[in-house]
Each structure stands twice: as C-alpha cells, then as structure tokens.
C-alpha cells in the first residue's frame, strides 16, 4: 500500500518549487531599479529531481568525488545578465517578466493536475 504523498506524485513538490521560484522572480522584478541588486533564480529541474529523489548520485567507490555546490543544496543562484547595467544591477526586466509568466503558467498547470489527482482519490474513497 502506498502513502497519500505517493499518490500525489511529483505535482505537490513541483507546486512548492514553483511558488519558491515565483517569490524569487517577483523579488527580482521589484528590485529592478535597486543599484547592485543581483537577480536570483533556482534551477527548477535540478531542484525537482533532488526533491523527488531521482537526482541523487550514488558513489560506488571511496575515491569518487561528492557532488556539491549551491544548486545541489537547493540554494538560489545568481543569474548572469546578458547586458549588465552600469549601476551593478543584474535584473533584466524582459527576462524576468518572461520567466515569471512561464513559471506562473506552469504553476497553474501543476495546481490543475494536483486538483485532478485529489478529485480522483476522493472519488475512489467515496466509492463512486
């Protein structure tokens, strides 16, 4: 028998990560005029793999290197600008708005899939 969390699949984890990414992107947009502000983001694919356990690497020998770094620990990374500004701010409004719109659409999709999954579970529980 599997647990409730297993029944929700990856959608619940994706929803949490999309919300985290949305917060970072809105912070970037809000600080577009702040001198020396560095735009931040997460590597969604890597974070989802880490959260779902599919991205773990196994070492088979003592001489293997451990994988680390900010992305492996779930930290926000700084984005390198295509055209840096003179005041040191790395926010590129067009990039941020596009990433925000895409992330919001994917958040809504994950939410709809999660709602459908929960509705299916409720139907199974009620025996309808």
UniProtKB/Swiss-Prot annotation:
Keywords carried by this UniProt record: Bacterial flagellum
PROSITE patterns attached to this UniProt entry: FLAGELLA_BB_ROD
Primary residence: other
Keyword RNA-binding (UniProt): no
One cellular-component annotation, GO: bacterial-type flagellum basal body, rod
Cellular localisation: Bacterial flagellum basal body
Domain of life: Bacteria
Biological process annotations from GO: bacterial-type flagellum-dependent swarming motility
Subunit structure: The basal body constitutes a major portion of the flagellar organelle and consists of a number of rings mounted on a central rod. In Gram-negative bacteria, at least four rings, L, P, S and M are present, whereas Gram-positive bacteria lack the L and P rings. The rod consists of about 26 subunits of FlgG in the distal portion, and FlgB, FlgC and FlgF build up the proximal portion of the rod with about 6 subunits each.
Role played: Structural component of flagellum, the bacterial motility apparatus. Part of the rod structure of flagellar basal body.
PANTHER family reported for this sequence: FLAGELLAR BASAL BODY ROD PROTEIN FLGB, FLAGELLAR PROTEIN
Protein family (similarity comment): Belongs to the flagella basal body rod proteins family.
Protein name per UniProt: Flagellar basal body rod protein FlgB
Organism (species): Cereibacter sphaeroides (strain KD131 / KCTC 12085) (Rhodobacter sphaeroides)
Gene transcribed to yield this protein: flgB
């Amino acid at each position: 028998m599997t647990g409730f969390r297993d029944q929700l699949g990856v959608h619940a984890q994706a929803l949490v990560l999309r919300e985290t990414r949305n917060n970072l992107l809105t912070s970037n947009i809000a600080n577009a005029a702040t001198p020396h502000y560095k735009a931040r983001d997460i590597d969604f694919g890597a974070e989802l793999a880490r959260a779902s356990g599919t991205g773990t690497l196994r070492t088979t020998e003592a001489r293997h290197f451990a994988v680390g770094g900010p992305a492996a620990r779930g930290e926000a990374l700084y984005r390198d600008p295509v055209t840096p500004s003179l005041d040191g701010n790395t926010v590129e409004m067009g990039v941020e708005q596009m990433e925000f719109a895409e992330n919001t659409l994917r958040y809504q999709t994950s939410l709809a899939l999660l709602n459908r999954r929960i509705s299916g579970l409720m139907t199974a529980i009620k025996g309808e």
